[in-house]
Amino acid sequence: MGEKHERETIINKYKHKKAGSRNIDSISTNKLMEEFELIAKTFMGLEQVLAQELTQLGANNVQIGRRMVSFTGNKEMMYRANFQLHTAIRVLKPIAHFKANSAEDMYDEVRKIDWSKYILKGKTFSVDSVVYSEEFKNSRFVTYKVKDAIVDQFRENTGTRPNISVSNPDIRLNIHIAEDKATLSLDSSGESLHRRGYRQESVEAPLNEVLAAGMILMTGWKGETDFIDPMCGSGTLPIEAALIARNISPGVFRKEFAFEKWADFDQDLFDSIYNDESEEREFTHHIYGYDTDMKAVNTAKLNVAAAGFSKNITIEHKDFKNFTQPKDKSIIVMNPPYGERISTPNLLGTYKMIGERLKHQFMGNEAWILSYREECFREIGLKPSIKIPVYNGSLECEFRKYQMFDGKLNEFRAEGGIVKTEDEKKEMAQKHRFKKNREFKKRLDDTESNEEGDIRSFTFHSFEHERPDFGKKFNEKRKPRRNFGDDDRFGDDYKSFKGKKNFGGKKFDKGGKGGKNRYKNFDTNED
């Protein structure tokens, strides 16, 4: 009872209700229940996973597209989609669909929209363009044309024009053109949702957080066993696994979302979503991350502590070639080097070693491996039970499952063993869809500048070494929801990473100006 009581005390102590705030019950029911079209973007190969997340969240009219899932929902659903989805890159709210066969057509259609409803006086805006069209070959040209139409409307109606802000706009717009079909949307997310907010430092070619979460969700693991990443790098897979195991919303670390700057932003509604911990659950197993690079190990420990999962995750300096059979039921999910961006002296030998360790030291468990080189997979020397195609940036990879059992396959099945579930068979079927869309890969380089934060954002900067003034600017703009240094909940092991600095659980400041602090702590003794 002591540990449970302690956790409840911490949660209750740091939950605040702003004085004088409106009761959600008093808000117009019609406004809250009004549904509209929404689009969640993701990586190629994760659409099915994202659709399942949206369905579980309660979204309506869920339909899968290429690198996106469309759905309908009200304002609460839009807030929840940003805050709770693990596999969404951003959430868009379409405000206009139209056909444009020329630049003049597009300009005229954009001017038809009443922009005074979306961009208030004194507010700034930006436009991102994604273009797949023979007519509109230059995305920057599309961006400028949309911007001109908006600015000209304001100048004609008011005599003044809104300013453009690329780095920190009040309103973010997104236009998507496929041949002559255009969709103009409000970007409700802002910075790409893969930027969770817990990453303090990184290593070369870190795994994108959205892709990591998608990989874990594709395995079906939700915390029922121990989780092992034997080549953990900066710790992305272990941290995303902890979020999934404890059912914690990945948006909890975010400083802000774009919708918080909208004219119709409902602070009370978002506070109720943020403070709702009813779906969080206990995690009775453990997560392990190993790496041979000591710098990666220290970086992973730093990121794990920043996320508040030191009780759930153990990071150690270990070589997988010395891996031995775990005592408890476990799953391995790993992202070994491919040789594309990271130079590995004996790449094929590494994969051969992986297969040998799995075959002799992982009986009775399952392992999932992401790679894109067929010759690497061949060196593993094991037959995968499932192959799921997925893109890692511009690399067309495969995520393969290896069911490790002792003896013959027929004997394993006779004893009730399952090599491939029905859901996994459906995922496998997606491979044929990929083969029909090979041309998409050729377009990725063309769209890199359009969606740098979505598709190719694998470079993260050290806050300490490369941006010494980051902390000052960060706090001047808006206090983060998690603020290191509040207490000693992370323990002495974390202090050693930062010398005299004490990085406790981050303190959350919601509500913009005058907002009271909220705190969330995931590192309690109960875990």
Task: Please place each PLM-identified region on the residue numbering.
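Short SAM/SAH-binding signature in class I
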Residues: 329-335
